[in-house]
UniProtKB/Swiss-Prot annotation:
Region (Disordered): 252-283, 316-364
Function noted in UniProt: Involved in glucose repression of the SUC2 gene.
Keyword Transcription (UniProt): yes
Keywords assigned: Carbohydrate metabolism, DNA-binding, Metal-binding, Nucleus, Repeat, Repressor, Transcription, Transcription regulation, Zinc, Zinc-finger
Name of the molecule in the record: Regulatory protein MIG2
Family label: Belongs to the creA/MIG C2H2-type zinc-finger protein family.
């Protein structure tokens, strides 16, 4: 008893709920009831796992016990999955073989008269399924490296024979399989390049009994393909093409650009039109623009203008001023009739005094303008 009292907590005297047997105190009543089961031997929590009849007084003890069952079942599942994988590998459907080749089983439904007998890799025994559902093994290369001849071949049987009378003949079955593929490829119309590749693929090969069956010998194909592409005729054609291209470039560099006849469009002298634009052909912008002949052409085309009415942002804009010649003024005086025409004439005389005369600028007679104005302002004819 004194040994049990040493295990009591420090505030055991202050706890409201005490055990009548060992005088241990508890803060909550359910904790006291759970403690009483240790004295009475009551175990209300039973294990529900099949085949296990253990019982526990506390629920946490039952949970700890259930972990042993779940962990054991997980171990059993792992063991069963490993055994299943080993069975598939032994039965001729390996999932991953030595990290190089991958066999992907694809179930295929075939009629009863076309059922395929798959020979097991280890043991040499024949498996024949009566329900005509057989896995088709498709080889997939996991690495592009060439495979040695001792580890590459696949032999499916071609005729469903009974187990009692069937004897595995690997070389004959594989030869018939190759002959059927060759007949299918010979009937198809393909180009010469692919036909040559098919001929190389369909060459007869040995059929060793190795776990990595179902692969073609591809180690000599890249060398033969490179040998074909590097033929002397192709090399000769490339050489002649390079020679002709070099000669054409050399003649192009020696040529001098022909200076096209340039037309000069002069605009009125104005401080705003100080810049000019060259209207020469695009031949001057070739890489050999530093030639002296092209510099001369550029100097000749310096005075060519594309737009006579260009304005720049830095120049000062002024209103255009025109002056009517004296002959036109006399015509307007003779043709004016009425107060409106006299007013227009006086305005023209006043404005003409303040305008500057510009060379090469002529306006139509004022009488024509006035006639057009009268026609425009007059009654419209329907």
């Amino acid at each position: 008893m004194p040994k049990k009292q040493t295990n009591f907590p420090v505030d055991n005297e202050n706890r409201p709920f005490r055990c009548d047997t060992c005088h241990r105190g508890f803060h909550r009543l359910e904790h006291k009831k759970r403690h009483l089961r240790t004295h009475t031997g009551e175990k209300p929590h039973h294990c529900a796992f099949p085949g296990c009849g253990k019982s526990f007084s506390r629920s946490d003890e039952l949970k700890r016990h259930m972990r042993t069952h779940t962990g054991q079942s997980q171990r059993r599942l792992k063991k069963a999955s490993v055994q299943k994988q080993e069975f598939l590998t032994v039965s001729g459907i390996p999932t991953i073989a030595s990290g190089v080749m991958i066999h992907q089983p694809i179930p295929q439904v075939l009629p009863a008269n076309m059922a395929i007998n798959v020979q097991a890799v280890n043991g040499g025994n024949i498996i024949h399924a009566p329900n005509a559902v057989h896995p088709m093994v498709i080889p997939i290369m996991a690495q592009p490296a060439p495979i040695h001849a001792s580890a590459a071949s696949f032999q499916p049987a071609t005729s469903p024979m009974p187990i009692s009378t069937y004897t595995p003949v690997p070389s004959q079955s594989f030869t018939s399989f190759q002959s059927s593929i060759g007949s299918i490829q010979s009937n198809s119309d393909v180009s010469s390049i692919f036909s040559n590749m098919n001929v190389r693929v369909n060459t007869p090969r040995s059929v060793p009994n190795s776990p990595n069956d179902g692969y073609l010998h591809q180690q000599h194909i890249p060398q033969q393909y490179q040998h074909q592409t590097a033929s002397p005729s192709v090399a000769k054609q490339q050489k002649t093409f390079a020679h002709s291209l070099a000669s054409a470039l050399s003649t192009l560099q020696k040529r001098t650009p022909v200076s096209a006849p340039s037309t000069t469009i002069e605009s009125p002298s104005s401080p705003s039109d100080s810049s000019h634009t060259s209207a020469s052909s695009s031949a001057i912008s070739l890489p050999f623009s530093n030639a002296p002949s092209q510099l001369a052409v550029a100097k000749e085309l310096e005075s060519v203008y594309l737009d006579s009415n260009r304005y720049t942002t830095k120049t000062r804009r002024e209103r255009a001023k025109f002056e009517i010649p004296e002959e036109q003024e006399e015509d307007t005086n003779n043709s004016s009739s009425g107060s409106n025409e006299e007013e227009h004439e006086s305005l023209d005389h006043e404005s003409s005094k303040s305008r500057k005369k510009l060379s090469g600028v002529k306006l139509p007679p004022v009488r024509n303008l006035l006639k057009q104005i009268d026609v425009f302002n007059g009654p419209k004819r329907v």
